């Protein structure tokens, strides 16, 4: 019996299981549940349920970076070798080919007093899941941090300092929100540099038809899309 080979196989199987294992996170009151996993192509995928009813279907996460120009020295992080076009195509991919390196959960609860506003005190209470994702093909990693509150979910991408991800331009955000129906939303037009809008209440399907009415023109408003919104 080759004990060394068996131990190696067990370690490999454990790593493979860890790389694809589904992670779960619940809100402090237990009403919301989020799941996170990697699909067959190593793409990050999440879902969200409320009281055991799915509200966000499997939705992918990730970023598409601006493809670097091999003929411009200033565009990419310097190496002695000039990259070929295929390598640059792969390098622009920050949405596939990940493996799960680590997953950490935590809870945070504080109450703070705003200087002014409608509420005397505001409670900041959430459960957190931070997943560290390695991308072997590009020798880099990123963290996706989820925070699940009693009234909703938030997440962000984090890029710790590392040799192969120092400078980059985001071409396209590939974060998906695959809603399960034509839900009601409280929204303002998505803008480049302001939130100076009144909120509109409507179904998701009504966004395009109401966009012009929602824009009360002033010098600070520059909507970027007829359906681009910030929602609540």
Task: List the predicted regions and their residue ranges.
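Bacterial Sec-dependent N-terminal signal peptides
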Residues: 1-24
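N-terminal accessory beta-strand-rich subdomains and adjacent acidic, glycine-rich linkers
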Residues: 24-232
């Amino acid at each position: 019996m080759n004990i060394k080979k068996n131990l190696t196989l067990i370690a490999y199987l454990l790593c493979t299981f860890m790389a694809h294992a589904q992670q779960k996170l619940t809100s402090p009151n237990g009403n919301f549940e989020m799941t996170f996993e990697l699909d067959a192509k190593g793409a990050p995928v999440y879902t969200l349920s409320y009281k055991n009813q799915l509200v966000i279907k499997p939705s992918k996460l990730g970023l598409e970076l601006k493809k670097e120009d091999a003929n411009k020295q200033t565009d990419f992080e310097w190496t002695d070798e000039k990259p070929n076009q295929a390598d640059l195509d792969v390098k622009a991919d920050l949405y596939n080919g990940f493996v799960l390196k680590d997953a950490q959960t935590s809870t945070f609860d504080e109450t703070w007093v705003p200087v002014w506003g409608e509420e005397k005190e505001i409670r900041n209470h959430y459960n957190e899941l931070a997943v560290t994702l390695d991308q072997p093909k590009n020798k880099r990693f990123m963290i996706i941090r989820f925070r699940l509150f009693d009234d909703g979910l938030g997440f962000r991408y984090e890029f710790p300092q590392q040799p192969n991800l120092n400078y980059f331009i985001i071409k396209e955000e590939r974060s998906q929100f695959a809603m399960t129906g034509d839900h009601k939303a409280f929204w303002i037009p998505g803008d480049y540099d302001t939130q100076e809008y009144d909120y509109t209440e409507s179904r998701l399907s009504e966004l395009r038809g109401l966009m012009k009415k929602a824009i009360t023109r002033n010098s600070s408003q520059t909507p970027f899309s007829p359906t681009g919104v910030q929602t609540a």
